From Swiss-Prot:
Name this protein carries in UniProt: HTH-type pyridoxine biosynthesis transcriptional regulator PdxR
Residue ranges: DNA binding: 43-62
Similarity field: In the C-terminal section; belongs to the class-I pyridoxal-phosphate-dependent aminotransferase family.
Swiss-Prot/TrEMBL keywords: Aminotransferase, DNA-binding, Pyridoxal phosphate, Transcription, Transcription regulation, Transferase
The species this protein was found in: Corynebacterium glutamicum (strain ATCC 13032 / DSM 20300 / JCM 1318 / BCRC 11384 / CCUG 27702 / LMG 3730 / NBRC 12168 / NCIMB 10025 / NRRL B-2784 / 534)
Gene: pdxR
């Protein structure tokens, strides 16, 4: 057995940790570094070596065993399948390079949470239970136990009453939106906020729908400016992206009235709703119009995006249509992951974790405000919730982004979030995933980069 498998995982890639691990073990086999009969580390040992959850390793091992790469036997551990037929190992040509590869940038992507304290006893216990008693079947809508726990979680955390049969388990907001849009006749006219989340803007276009930019201000969507010929409207009422406005009650009422008058579907992205630092969050839009609203939810901000699990809530008739389509396309979230999340939710650990994260992020938010709040020639937009900040500046945003990249920091130009012209000048950066010392260093670099001096 190799003392340490030559594997390097990147938690900030869009590909999940189990998928990265699966691909890299396949590659080691293809290159002849791992050969038939070679023993592999136990899931516990490899998870410790790589600094990932044991559940991620178990999921990867299960996938590889199903593909015939691995063999597992009680008492003898996990090995590369002795009967695996291999092609000649691929020799990878080593090319000389005239310059060194630049080091990876420190990830300041918006929405990345702090996972340093995630792997506590409740999290480990949930994955142990899921791996010890893996489900044998996952319904199209997702495990009933998980849907029951999601319904209870929403009742306690968001004051929302839903039934398990109205819930579809998804691989996150983007996947849930994609599933929903596949049930709509193309080309539908889909209203999207401008500025808004770029990938949620692109998904309708990829599926053959037309996107129509709708304006926002410091409070979010502006209902009076909505056109009357939209089939659906994608809206973030709890935490508008990226500016963070929360849609006030009068606008919510006006939005529901607009939807009813125009027979339009409201697609509510409940992004960052549980991470609010000022006042109490308003109930979801779905509470006002349950028969006209589809709610997209995810656990990425309070657990980790690498879990790749979320939910979609629809009126019962539409939920049946979505479940039928899900049965055709397949359930993208593994049953073991669903079982582990159900156990984690049932233990109450996620509610306790969310409370701890609010305190942690509120402190980091204060550091951002204290450092950047009074910088000359800039304006720090209010941070009422979420894991990112928006800093308007007089210095050209592309120059700021380039300067910070040269110092090993990746921030996003504010214009990235606009569908067309009229973008404000500034940057967007996440502050949730790094410790206090790192955050203070990052903010000092940002302060210097936006300076006109």
């Amino acid at each position: 057995m190799l003392a340490d498998l030559p594997i390097a995982l990147n938690p900030h890639e869009p590909t999940s940790i189990p998928t990265q691990l699966t691909e890299q073990i396949r590659r080691l086999v293809a290159r002849g570094i791992l050969t038939p009969g070679d023993p592999l580390p136990s899931s516990r040992s490899l998870s410790t070596q790589l600094g990932v959850s044991r559940g991620s390793v178990v999921t990867a091992y299960d996938q590889l065993a199903g593909e015939g790469y691995l063999s597992t036997a009680r008492g003898s551990g996990t090995t590369i399948n002795p009967d695996l037929h291999l092609l000649k190992p691929v020799e990878i040509e080593k090319k000389e390079t005239s310059r060194s590869v630049p080091p990876p940038l420190l990830n300041l992507s918006p929405g990345v949470p702090d996972t340093a304290t995630l792997a506590d006893s409740a999290w480990r216990a949930a994955w142990r239970e899921a791996c010890a008693k893996p489900p044998t079947h996952s319904p199209e809508q997702g495990l009933l136990r998980l849907r029951i726990e999601i319904a209870d979680h929403l009742r306690q955390m968001r004051g929302l009453m839903v039934e398990p049969e109205q819930i579809i388990v998804t691989a996150g907001a983007r996947e849930g939106l994609s599933l929903l849009l596949r049930t709509m006749d193309a080309p539908a006219r889909i209203g999207v906020e401008s500025p808004g989340y770029p990938s949620l803007r692109r998904i309708p276009q990829v599926l053959g729908h037309e996107t129509i930019d709708v304006p926002t201000d410091e409070s979010g969507l502006v209902p009076r400016a909505l056109p009357h010929d939209l089939n659906a409207l994608l809206v973030t009422p709890s935490h508008q992206y990226p500016y963070g406005g929360s849609l006030p009650a009068d606008r919510r009422t006006a939005l529901v009235a607009w939807a009813e008058a125009n027979d339009a579907l409201l697609i509510e992205d409940d992004f960052d709703s549980e991470l609010r630092y000022v006042g109490m969050p308003l109930p979801p839009l779905r509470a006002l119009a349950p028969d006209r609203t589809i709610l997209l939810g995810t656990f990425s901000s309070v657990i980790t995006p690498q879990v790749a699990c979320g939910y979609l809530i629809a009126p019962t008739p539409q939920a049946r249509v979505l479940a039928t389509l899900r049965g055709i396309l397949g359930q993208p979230v593994g049953a073991i992951t669903q079982h582990a999340l159900a156990s984690y939710l049932a233990s109450g650990a996620l509610r306790r974790r969310t409370q701890r994260l609010r305190r942690l992020y509120r402190h980091r938010r204060s550091i951002v405000q204290d450092t950047l709040g009074d910088l000359p020639n800039t304006q720090l937009r209010p941070i009422n919730g979420g894991l990112h900040a928006v800093l308007l500046c007089d210095k050209p945003q592309d120059l700021v982004v380039t300067t910070l990249a040269s110092r090993g920091l990746n921030v996003t130009a504010l214009s990235h979030y606009w569908g067309g012209t009229g973008a404000d000048n500034g940057i967007v950066f996440g502050f949730g995933s790094h410790d206090e010392d790192t955050l203070r260093w990052v903010l000092a670099e940002i302060s210097d980069a936006v300076s006109l001096g």
